[in-house]
Amino acid sequence: MRRVIFGKVSCGCAMPYGNLDPAHMKLVQWVRFTWELDKLPTLSAALPAHYFLTSANRGDEKELRAVIERSFVQDTSWGDAIHEVNSMLNGWLERTFEPEKSGICLALRHGLRMIGASILVPDPTAGNHLTPGPCVLMEYRNRGLGTALLVESLRQLRAAGLSRAAALTKSNAPVAKFLYPKFNGVVSPGDTPALVA
């Protein structure tokens, strides 16, 4: 069963996200970063005290969704693509938590509070293994936490048997400027991601 989500798009009308047409979408420049996982050195990133990474499961889904959605909504660089991103997020999260899927969810916590997350697709044929990529709440950014999430994401993908990982993002997003170039991330033009699950 496909869930249809209604919301306001840039023109002010309400329409299902799954039916976005070019008249309702701004042109977004996407880029793809790739990492040769088997050529990376041993990956590690120290977290500050009281921060830790855990696996997330279906019981964490509501909190995970909230953290990922807030990290995008509060980041003004995503304003021109927020409706497309919301549609993609719903599809990614739905597929990740399906019982037969092998998605990996990482939760970054400060004490008991989830403050960051990363969803991984360990399928070698996937075009985007970091969906939607390391997400950290705005008030916790610029502390090395996104780097720690990226390191653990790449480490988990390598442990799952992938030799190469890819991530798709907007060309002007903070991850494209500051995070993904780390660890020898190579940038190339990206395709527009699918909008529905």
Describe these PLM feature segments.
Residues T76-H129, G133-P134:
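A conserved beta-strand-loop-helix scaffold within acyl/acetyltransferase catalytic domains
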Residues R2-S10, L157-T169:
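Conserved GNAT acetyl-CoA-binding A-motif
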Residues F52-V67:
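A short beta-loop-alpha structural element at the N-terminal edge
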Residues M1-H50, P193-A197:
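Acyl-donor-binding surface of acyltransferase catalytic domains
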Residues L64-F72, L89, L157:
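Hydrophobic alpha-helical core bundles mediating ligand binding, dimerization, or RNAP-core interactions
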Residues M1, V136, N142-A159, F178-K182:
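Conserved acetyl-CoA-binding loop-helix of GNAT-fold acetyltransferases
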Residues P134-V136, T169:
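Hydrophobic adenine-recognition pocket in adenosine-nucleotide-binding enzymes
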